[in-house]
């Protein structure tokens, strides 16, 4: 089957159409703006899969309806999913704009005095607003000379932020969320909302019963040679942690081997269900070989599966990581307990950064007073105002141990195309695999246990659905925290020490939900959250605006907030603008 091509970014150079000297004097400058924009994006941004982003430039500068239509015809044939219009001069507003209502679009009007690029920018944005097709405005802070071909830093930041978010929108469109199972333990996020995926994300939902996973395992609908490779890899790389089960629940060596084998098979089969596997076609299993075109998935697990079969912890942890027995590769997005809304937050983070995501319970707020009472030690540094214990039963990406290193040698989680095999091995070495606690998981399994290194910048996010309002996004930028070992051990043991832990300290603003750490915990909208590497809340805000998802909670600096220009017409309070604009325009793919 032919592979689906990746979305491209279309660059639209628009120009003053008056001949006999005006257009002719601007052709080279205008087209050079387009080429410079394309070069910047190609150099600085990759798709989440690691592929280089392709830009498609209109064949000619666009002065009016005819050339605009020719450009659109070219873009339609090239899978252009995002457009950036550029100009150094006055052009004819509504005659030259991109009118596709579902394609993210921005306009860069050159800030120069020789020709009024800013005037076109304002006129074109007015047309977009009047027609109900929001666009992003890009206008440099400082005046440039007409022959200055450089892209100022503030313009570059907006171009790249727009491009990252726009590509995320285009990449999700037409894909599916694979729901393996149904509602897990009454968790609302696993009540998968088809309308949300269809209307806001342009995606479909593929619902598959967990018996399909059982069938694939029992009937050997997988690559048997790959299973042997996976087992050998696990034998070489897995370090096993303590078995905290009572003696009557401990498994013998043969039983543990069977649990490991099934856990690895679950990873293989869920992956094959998501993206397909041509090896299955070679076995005559053509239908199963196709997969479900899933860009994200969720596995119910508890309790209808886990009461009798190994849990999903190992499978989910490995799929969510940037490496496995096949080496370093793009991480998958697989939500524990089929929490589709947390899965969407994971999907957003992965599409924006190319990195693995940490799925976690937002488990406990530890006040400085409570920590000192329990441990006899005081919190300090980033943790001085309190911490949030982010922990789940072992399904977080192993990258979350933060044994990868950035250019300055600091702990981080890299885009998968930058990860070395040595860094992948270091993450594995920092992970223990602990037998699942019988009281939770009667069918057994292995939970990954690691501790995230401290001082690493993270952005915690979550999507929630509010009846009568629709989806909303929560964002909390902060840092991982390293606690003294004795303190960590004592606090960790009060929850479950066989699971992975990140101690998180959000950045406080002294206002609203970020008045203090307790307020962050108290205002979080669900029991789960996602950690994405870096302080990238501004990118999430831009993406949410494109999809018409209002942001109900964030601690991003106001100067970094970048939304379509029409948002400014929806009131003077910046967050109220977001709600009113999202309500006014409705979901991007409204049905």
From Swiss-Prot:
Name the reaction it catalyses.
Answer: L-fucose = L-fuculose
PANTHER family attached to this UniProt entry: L-FUCOSE ISOMERASE
Active-site residues are 337 (proton acceptor), 361 (proton acceptor)
Main enzyme class = isomerase
Pfam families (alphabetical): Fucose_iso_C, Fucose_iso_N1, Fucose_iso_N2
Q: Which cofactors does this protein require?
A: Mn(2+)
This protein's major location comes to cytoplasm
Q: What is this protein called?
A: L-fucose isomerase
Keyword Magnesium included in the entry's annotation: no
Residues reported in the UniProt entry to bind Mn(2+)? 337, 361, 528
Q: Name one GO molecular function term.
A: manganese ion binding
Q: Which family does it belong to?
A: Belongs to the L-fucose isomerase family.
Give the gene that encodes this protein.
fucI
Which species is the source of this protein? Salmonella choleraesuis (strain SC-B67)
What exactly does this protein do?
Answer: Converts the aldose L-fucose into the corresponding ketose L-fuculose.
Annotated GO biological processes are:
D-arabinose catabolic process; L-fucose catabolic process
């Amino acid at each position: 089957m032919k592979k689906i091509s990746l979305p491209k970014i279309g660059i639209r150079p628009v120009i003053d159409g008056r001949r006999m000297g005006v257009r002719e004097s601007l052709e080279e400058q205008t087209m050079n703006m387009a080429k410079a924009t394309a070069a910047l994006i190609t150099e600085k941004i990759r798709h989440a899969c690691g592929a280089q982003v392709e830009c498609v430039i209109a064949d000619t500068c666009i002065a009016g309806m005819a050339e605009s239509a020719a450009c659109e015809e070219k873009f339609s044939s090239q899978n252009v999913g995002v457009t950036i219009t550029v100009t150094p001069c006055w052009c004819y507003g509504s005659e030259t704009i991109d009118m596709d209502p579902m394609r993210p679009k921005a306009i860069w009007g050159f800030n120069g005095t020789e020709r009024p690029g800013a005037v076109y920018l304002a006129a074109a944005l007015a047309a977009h607003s009047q027609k109900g097709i929001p666009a992003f405005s890009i206008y440099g802070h400082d005046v440039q000379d007409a022959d200055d071909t450089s892209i100022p830093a503030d313009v570059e930041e907006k171009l790249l932020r727009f491009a990252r978010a726009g590509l995320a929108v285009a990449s999700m469109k037409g894909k599916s969320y694979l729901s393996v199972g149904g509602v897990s333990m009454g968790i609302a996020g696993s009540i998968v909302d088809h309308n949300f995926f269809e209307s806001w994300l342009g995606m479909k939902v593929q619902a598959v019963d967990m018996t399909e996973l059982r069938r694939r395992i029992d009937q050997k609908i997988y690559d048997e040679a790959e299973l042997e490779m996976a087992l050998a890899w696990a034998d070489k790389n897995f370090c096993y942690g303590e078995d905290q089960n009572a003696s009557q629940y401990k498994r013998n060596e043969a039983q543990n081997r069977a649990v490991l084998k099934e856990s690895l098979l679950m990873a293989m089969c869920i992956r094959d269900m998501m993206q397909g596997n041509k090896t299955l076609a070679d076995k005559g299993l053509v239908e199963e070989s196709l997969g479900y075109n899933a860009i994200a998935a969720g596995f119910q697990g508890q309790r209808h599966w886990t009461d009798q079969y190994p849990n999903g912890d190992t499978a989910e942890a490995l799929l969510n990581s940037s490496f496995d027995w096949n080496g370093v590769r793009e991480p998958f997005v697989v939500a524990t307990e089929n929490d589709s809304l947390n899965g969407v937050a994971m999907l957003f983070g992965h599409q924006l950064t190319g990195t693995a995501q940490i799925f976690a319970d937002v488990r406990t707020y530890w006040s400085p007073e409570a920590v000192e009472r329990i441990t006899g030690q005081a919190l300090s540094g980033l943790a001085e105002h309190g911490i949030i214990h982010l922990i789940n039963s072992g399904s977080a990406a192993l990258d979350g141990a933060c044994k990868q290193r950035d250019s300055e040698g600091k702990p981080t989680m890299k885009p998968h195309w930058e990860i070395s095999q040595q860094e992948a091995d270091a993450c594995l070495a920092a992970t223990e695999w602990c037998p699942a606690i019988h009281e939770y998981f009667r069918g057994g399994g292995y939970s990954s246990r690691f501790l995230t290194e401290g001082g690493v910048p993270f952005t915690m996010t979550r999507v929630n659905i509010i009846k009568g309002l629709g989806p909303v996004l929560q964002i909390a930028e902060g840092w991982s925290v390293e606690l003294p070992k004795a303190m960590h051990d004592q606090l960790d043991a009060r929850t479950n020490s066989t699971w992975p832990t990140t101690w998180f300290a959000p950045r406080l603003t002294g206002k609203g939900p970020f008045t203090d750490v307790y307020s962050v915990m108290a205002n979080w909208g669900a029991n789960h959250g996602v950690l994405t590497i870096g302080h990238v809340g501004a990118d999430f805000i831009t993406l949410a605006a494109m999809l018409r998802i209002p942001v109900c909670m964030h601690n991003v600096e106001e100067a970094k907030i970048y939304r379509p220009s029409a948002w400014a017409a929806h009131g003077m309070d910046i967050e109220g603008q977001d709600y009113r604009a999202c309500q006014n325009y409705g979901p991007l793919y409204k049905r």
